[in-house]
Amino acid sequence: MAPSPQQDAILTLDGVVAGYGKMTILNGVSATIRRGAITTVIGPNGAGKSTLFKTVFGLLGVRTGRVTFDGADTTSFEPRRMLDAGVSYVPQGRNLFPELSVRHNLELGGVALSDTSRLAGRMDEMMARFPMLRDKANAQASTLSGGQQKLLEVARGLLLEPKLTLIDEPSIGLSPLMVQEVFSILKDLRSAGVSILMIEQNARQALAISDYGLVLEQGQTRIEDTAQNILADPRIAQLFLGGGLAPATSETSR
């Protein structure tokens, strides 16, 4: 069941403009990401989805507009400050050190923890939550399957107990069975109180486990609604077939 409209926001974007060099990718994105929910961002290639995540996490500067996380203005925050504030980021693709062990790769997610006892405790918690990582703790990361590597990246992102996790295309290169496992873990994280903002190419499957959805096109928010309503919107089928979205109506766009 989707959270109520009164549920408070953990992240808001207000007219955010960002890009690379002279190229503008995000052209006034506004959105509200609800606390304790899974929100999936979809849209055609080049819509600005990954750029949105990089901007929220502080990897890319905001030219104009405002980003607010958990009630604080984080528009100018760099990645380390976003980590400290409670945001983790799992980028697209493989982002592990293949020659290091599973345990060492996981420990790298806790570089911001100065308390070694707390780090040890969080490591134990992650090993318990992800039994596969415990069983392969001393194996090189390069020996893991694609799905296992993705689970390791997710676990590493959770080591600092984030309030919000940004996950970019978690299903890329995974078998259908492993995709189901990853999505099941995301649902468990939501139940544990972690807010999740996800980009996913398998939009229908992702929206099926999501509470909310956000459709981007040409660097702008075109639809922001419950996942259920987006799944039922006939314009989404046109988007998936490669066409643009028709002008949004007041019933499904806000």
Regions found by a protein language model. Give the residues of each.
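Conserved ABC transporter NBD signature motif
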Residues: 65-73, 85, 119-123, 225
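Helix-to-loop junction immediately C-terminal to a conserved catalytic motif
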Residues: 57
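The feature captures the beta-strand-to-loop junction immediately N-terminal to the Walker
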Residues: 42-44
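ABC-type ATPase nucleotide-binding domains, specifically the catalytic core motifs of the NBD
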Residues: 21, 39, 61, 102-121, ...
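Conserved ABC ATPase signature
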Residues: 140-144
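ABC ATPase C-loop
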Residues: 157-158
